[in-house]
Every structure is written in C-alpha cells, then in structure tokens.
Regions:
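Transmembrane alpha-helical segments
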Residues: 116-121, 234, 238, 328, ...
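Active-site lumenal/periplasmic loops and adjacent helix-entry segments of GT-C-fold
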Residues: 5, 113-295, 330-334, 583-584, ...
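Membrane-embedded, hydrophobic transmembrane alpha-helices
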Residues: 1-103, 350, 359-365, 384-403
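Membrane-interface alpha helices of multi-pass inner-membrane proteins
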Residues: 280-282, 315-330
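Start-transfer (signal-anchor) and selected internal transmembrane alpha helices
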Residues: 66-130, 222, 226, 414-417
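Hydrophobic, aromatic-rich transmembrane alpha-helices
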Residues: 298-306, 339-351, 403-420, 478-498, ...
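Signature aromatic-anchored transmembrane alpha helix within multi-pass, membrane-resident enzymes
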Residues: 359-370, 403-409, 422-437, 544-574
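Extracytoplasmic
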Residues: 540, 546, 550-706
C-alpha cells in the first residue's frame, strides 16, 4: 500500500543507495584526473541516471516488476566491473580523497541549499493532516498529482511504456524517467511519500553542486562562481517593489506574501511577474525540470572541458549523458542541442582561422536583418500597432535567421574539411554527435515526435508569456539587476566568454517566437538555460567592477546593496514556500477509499469517477479512471476530453442504458461521493441495479459492476 512498510522503506532506500554508490565508483574510475568533489558530482549524477535507465530498459522486455529491477542491478554490477577495465590504471582501491579549500567552500552553500530543499520538499509532499488527509504545499499543489500517477501507474500496469491512468487509451510520452526513478524505490514496498522525496533530494544536490562546479570551471575565480551561484539559487527581479508600496498605510500588502496563494515577488500574475524562482516554482514542483537541470549542468561541465579545454575524451561522456536526456527532460535535451550547436559553430569558425572580430559583424548583421524582417512583417500584416500579427513576424525572423545560420554552418564545415580538418572534427564533435543521435533518436521516435504532433505543440507565438508590458520592461522588472547588467557584461566579456554565452541568442530567439507546447509558460524551460549562461558572464562583470573600485569608500555597501536587490525577491518567495505547507489535497475520506482500493481491487481496474483535478485513486493507487482533469489533458496534448466528460456524465445519469459506454471504457467500479454528486446528476438507484456496493464509508460508496 502507499503507506509502505519498514522493510519496504529499507529495501527501497538500499536499492537507491547502491546505484548512487556505483555511480561514484564508476566516476572515480573514469575521471581519475579530476578533483574528488568533481568525481562525487559526476558520480551521483551517473548513479541517478543509471537508476532511471537500467530498470526501464529491462522493463521494456520483461515488464515493470521486481525481477526487472534485480536484473538491472546485475547489469549495474557489470558496469562497475567494466569501469575498472576502462580505467587507465585499474585499481579497485584507487580513491583519491584530496579536498581543496575551494571544494569545502563550495560544499557549504550547496549542502545548505540541499538541506533546505529537503525540508521544504518533505513538508510539501503527502504530509498527514490532523484529520487523516494529506497536505501538500503551494508550489506542488498543481503538478504533484500527475507525478504521483506516473510513479504508481507503471507498477500497477506492469509495463513500459505505460499509459496515462487519467486517459487510459493514451501512452505516456512525457519524459517519465524523472518519475519512474521513484517507482524503482516504491516497487520494493517503500512508502509512496519517501519514494517521491528521496530521489529529488539527490537531484537537488546534483543541481546545486553542478551549477557551482560549472561556474568554477568556467569563471576560474571562486568569488565569481559564488556570485553566479547566488544569482542562480536566489533569482528574482524587482517584484518585491509591489509589496513595499504603501507599507506604512497597509502592512497587509507585505504580509500577503506569506499568507496568500501565489502572491509572491517572483510569481505575481496580475502584475506580469512571471520569472519564477528556481527553487520555489521549478525545482520543488517540476521533477522533469529538476532532473533535467541535473543533466544540463553535468553535460555543460563535461562539454566545456571538451570544447574549451580541448579534453577530447569528455566528448564521449557528454554525448552519453546528452543522448540519455530526452526521456528525462525534452526541453533540456533541446537546450543542450542548441548550446552544443552554437559552441561547435564557434569552434569551426576559429578552426577556419577567421578573425574573431568578423564574428561580431556577422552577429550584428543578423540582429539588423532580424529587426528589418520583424518590422516589415508587422507593417505588412497590420493596419495599426494593436492589429499586428506578431506571431508571424517572430516566425519570419526565426526562419530567416535559422536559414542563414544553417548556411554559415555548412560553409564552415566545408571550409574546414577542405583545409584537412576532417580528423579533428570527427574525433571531437563527430563522435559526440554520433553518440547523441544513437541514444536519443529511438526515444524521440518512440515518444517525443508523436506527442509533438498534438494540438498546441510547436506553434508560432511571439513574446513568451508577456501580455501587458512593453517588451524590454517586462524582462527588466522580472529579471531585475541581471537584466540591467547583461549588456555592459557582454561588452566587458572576453572572447572565450562570448563564445560560451553565444547560445543565449538562439535560445531566446526560439523561446520568444515559438510555443513549444500547449502551455506557452513552459517556454521558460528553454529560457532558464540561457539565463544560467547569462549570470555567468554577469557575475564575471560584477566582480570585475568591484575590483576596479578598490580603494573607493563605500564599495562594500554598494556591492551589498546590489546583491540584496538581486536576491530579495527570491529570498522572500523562498520564505513563503517554507511556510506554504497548508493545502489539503486529499481529504481523510478520499485517503481511506484510496487505501481500500489499493488493497482490495485488481491492479488493472478502471474506475468511474468525476474528472476532478486531484484524484486520490489515480494518484495514490495507480488505478485508472475513465477521465481525469482537463488541465492535464490540455498541457499534455491529450485528445477527446469533452467526449470523455460526456460519456462519464451519461454513465452516471443513465447507467442502465449505458452498457455500451461501460464496455467501451472497460469500467469495473463506480465511485459515488460528494465530488461526483457535485459534478453530475447521479442516478444511484439505477447504479444499484447494475452493480454491487462493495465500499461505503464517510459518504463515499464504491460499486462493482455485476
């Protein structure tokens, strides 16, 4: 049952731990020359990725069950042995525990943030209420149900791929490995709550450590890496100003941050504050984003060493991680693809021995061309500024600039091949690309491409989520000080740093002209990787300015003021999230009926319920319902919600004449409770004629069809 047992918790945690330890063992063998902390980072990422992938790979053949997980563990041991032989000097005991002062000062903020994450995550997931219900947090309330269903459903269905239990006819093409990593703990009898929480804490540790290690590698100076880490962990703009307005007259304007639902300095929809804090609204509620960022920073770390430090063996490891990313986070796979493509373009340009200043002129020409195309399209499609097809204008810019970049790409490849650079290209980017495509294409073909054909995916859309503010003001007030510093930071940046951050332009162009999924807000999953690159060069600039002010009185006060302005909105939002464990998503009667369902019904049973957003039967038990919440249908591109609603309504209102519908949807049980009675006309007398009551507690009845 979803409450788990002591032995189940122990087995699940042991299984998880063995994968993490094996990942560190493999990392130690493959990356002997790197620091101990780096090997820990790459090792915990490796262990997490192997826990995501090995059980699922075996489950494609044998089904999602304990046997598959045992075989996956045997394969893990095989990889451990293989890593020993791949090591340049294979010694099972060759562990270098060297720890620098910078490593220690890196771990301190990383561990503080990880512990804070664990505390908030634990308070936000399935906390028992005083009445026997389950409490969730502000940020997890909207997303957690679908994640719970993705954890429980594959175990009950016993298959991979598995199907949405809120829409049983539809295969899950969402990047589900971020959830089945918890299924691989839950399957041993662990509690659903701890199965959910444990991998996310490791994911948060990897994100924070990965971000810091990448910034240290790139920016070289610890102080710059620390500033970049702070900007990442506590991001926020000028949203705090909305809460300090008229504070003397109305104190409630400030305290509402900690009392109201989603009225924070980083998430205030009515005032167009949509640049949410990385901790509160991304890492806590969004598992695909959390584990996607884990992959992103590991790949960036390895790829940076390969591209800019010329460590060609890192192309192999970066390629493996990138190729395994689509079913962890499709958005991050796309972002990694764009970053890789732009970094490769910069390398090809330098290999062709063109002067770096010409790259600036080319970039400037593309900006001017894009502006001309945008303005020309606006003039052509509208008779006033309020009647312009901005979506089409953005698409035209994306298309034109994309074609030109592709032509430049092809030209540089041909020039380098003509100059005898084939071997150099093949044994670097060529190997990387082959590995990525070999691993990623089966995932994309089997899952991603099919889902992307659904309604609302890949459509023209200009100006992201901004519907009220002028274009630049929207980003200034949302991103705050970093938005004001990005231009001077770029002008101050070294040639190498400009190459590192060049992908920002392509990432932002795509995110600002295209809706990648039905919920355009989720384009922020492409914008955040651009932001991570931007804060690196901004941190570099901030420290440089501070050093140039040496000897000037008040520079410490100025620096402190700037940092406070950078993080105040984020800190206040995180404070709100810390106390936001107050929302009962499942009532005590709902939890009790879910417990009965989990213990007394078939794993493949289908239930007729109303289409409520948060359904304890689908979330806690993994069983299927005829029709789940409409919001999930919309954001996941699932079809026929209206038709399914009509079928459900018909079966409740006239069950005796709905035999065809009951058979069509393979209904086994009918639930009648306050939710159903509040949503439909429920003919309970007729239901009793076709089904037997098997549960009747707390105003909820469950009937089994005869």
């Amino acid at each position: 049952m979803f409450n788990g047992t002591f032995s189940g918790n122990l087995m699940g945690f042991l299984y998880f731990t063995l994968f993490i330890v094996s990942g560190v063992f493999i990392s130690n063998n493959l990356f002997k020359k790197l620091s101990f902390l780096t090997r820990i980072f790459l090792g915990t990422v490796t262990g997490t990725v192997l826990l995501m992938w090995l059980p699922v790979m075996v489950s494609f053949i044998l089904g999602f069950n304990v046997l598959s997980h045992i075989i996956a563990f045997v394969l893990l041991l095989g990889l451990d042995v293989l890593s020993v032989f791949l090591a340049k000097k294979p010694k099972l005991t060759s562990f270098n525990f060297s720890f620098s002062k910078d490593d220690l000062f890196t771990l301190i903020p990383v561990l503080i943030m990880t512990v804070f994450y664990g505390i908030v995550e634990a308070s936000h997931i399935m906390q028992p209420s005083e009445t026997g219900g389950m409490i969730f947090g502000q940020s997890t309330y909207a997303d957690v149900h679908i994640h719970l269903s993705f954890i429980t459903a594959p175990i009950k269905q016993g298959t991979v791929p598995f199907y949405y239990n809120i829409a049983p006819e539809n295969q899950v093409s969402y990047p589900f490995l971020s959830d089945t990593v918890s299924s691989s703990i839950y399957i041993f009898g662990a509690s659903l709550r701890w199965s959910y929480i444990i991998p996310t804490i490791m994911g948060a540790f990897n994100v924070y450590l990965g971000a810091f290690m990448f910034f240290r590698l790139w920016l070289k100076k610890f102080s710059k890496a620390l500033i970049a880490f702070i900007l990442f962990a506590f991001n926020g703009g000028f949203g705090f100003m909305y809460f300090f307005d008229n504070l003397r007259i109305n104190e409630d304007n400030f305290t509402r941050i900690f009392e109201k639902l989603y009225e924070t300095p980083t998430n205030l929809d009515g005032n167009m504050i949509r640049w949410v804090n990385t901790f509160c609204d991304m890492m806590i509620p969004q598992r695909a984003t959390l584990f996607g960022w884990m992959m992103l920073f590991a790949i960036l770390y390895l790829l940076y060493r390969a591209v800019f430090l010329k460590e060609n063996d890192k192309y192999i490891y970066a390629g493996v991680l990138a190729g395994l990313t689509p079913l962890i986070s499709t958005h991050i796979f796309l972002a990694v693809g764009i970053i890789s493509a732009v970094w490769m373009l910069s390398r090809l340009y330098l290999m062709a021995k063109f002067k770096p200043k010409y790259a600036f002129y080319i970039a400037l020409a593309l900006v001017v061309l894009g502006g001309i195309i945008f303005i020309a399209t606006c003039i052509k499609t509208g008779d006033s500024i309020m009647n312009v097809d901005y979506d089409q204008a953005g698409m035209n810019v994306l298309g034109a600039v994309g074609i030109i970049i592709a032509l430049i790409y092809a030209s540089l490849i041909l020039i380098n091949l003509f100059n005898g650079k084939f071997k150099e290209i093949f044994f670097s980017w060529g190997i990387y690309l082959i590995i990525v495509l070999a691993l990623a294409m089966p995932q994309l073909i089997k899952f991603t491409f099919g889902q992307a054909q659904g309604e609302g995916f890949l459509e023209p859309h200009f100006n992201w989520i901004n519907s009220k503010d002028s274009y630049f003001w929207f980003y200034v007030k949302n991103m705050g000080v970093p938005a004001l510093l990005i231009i001077p930071a770029l002008f101050n940046a070294s040639k190498r740093n400009l190459s590192v951050v060049a992908p920002i332009a392509v990432l932002m162009l795509l995110a600002e002209t295209f809706s990648l999924q039905p919920n355009v807000y989720d384009n922020n999953k492409i914008i955040y990787p651009a932001f991570f690159l931007a804060i690196g060069v901004i941190a570099d600039y901030m420290v440089s300015v501070y050093e140039k002010l040496k000897g000037i009185k008040g520079r410490e006060i100025l620096a402190t003021t700037v940092i406070i302005a950078c993080v105040l909105s984020g800190v206040l939002s995180m404070g709100r999230e810390y106390v936001a464990d107050e929302y009962e998503m499942f009532s005590s009667p709902q939890v009790q009926v879910a417990a009965w369902v989990d213990e007394n019904t078939e794993d493949d049973a289908v239930f007729l319920t109303n289409d409520r957003y948060n359904n304890a039967i689908t979330g806690l038990t993994g069983r299927s319902v005829v029709c789940g919440g409409g919001w999930f249908f919309s954001t996941h591109g699932l079809p026929n919600h209206s038709q399914l609603q009509n079928d459900v309504r018909q079966m409740y209102a006239d069950p005796e004449n709905s035999k065809v519908l009951f058979e069509k949807h393979r209904v086994d049980y009918i639930v009648v409770g306050p939710d159903e009675k509040g949503s439909y006309t429920v003919n309970e007398d007729a239901i009793k004629n076709i089904a037997d009551m098997v549960y009747n507690e707390n105003g909820i009845q469950v009937y089994k069809l005869k």
